[in-house]
Amino acid sequence: MAGISETGHLKVVTNFESLITSATAFGESYNPSTAGIKLLALQTLLTDSKASIDAVNIALIAYSNAVGVREAVFMPFSKLITRINSSLKASGATVQVINNAQTIVRKLQGKRAGTTLNEEEIKALEAGGDVVNQISVSQLSYDSRLGNFDKLITLLLSVPLYNPNEEDLKIESLKTLYAEFNARNNDVLTASIQLSNARIARNDVLYKPLTGLVDVATQAKLYIKSVFGATSPQYKQISKLNF
């Protein structure tokens, strides 16, 4: 299941619908004693399967939209941090405060205190199976950005000299912006959970042992094979439908 693409799941459902079409066309010859593969049961399972596919598609669109909104909200973030940093430096704050701020700013902008990895860092990364020249040492995940932005605001609150005239750099404005960032990040988290739940439900309908579409379809194919024979045109009609 994990390796099946969204189109792969849809193909399984499409093949199942073709199987039902063939079984229906067989007329009275398709008359299984097993309740789970009777035509009415197959039609019900097909309806549920299509609904589960639709639910994933809807959740996927909602997730993509939430990600897009979050990206748009965060787009000016790095430039804002640069302006905050410059304003703090111009405020007359102590060297210690400035240095503390730089640690946070580097994390927010994905910059290291040093420009190269030392030998111990390289060995540690290689031991973990990482390719050193592709290692990202930034902390640019959205959760990390939010955490570090909150730390920066807390630091600014402790600096009486940080009192810019620029409205968007004022601490209250930064708090409001943080709340907006956090809300949009939570929107993505919520959408991702809903998408995950939709996929779990779909996988249950399609792949649950015995009652899922795949096992039911396989059982129906075996029944058709038993009725008409392995070399019959009826069985050949459905034998290439993969599940």
Describe each PLM feature range.
Residues 1-243:
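Basic/polar low-complexity intrinsically disordered segments
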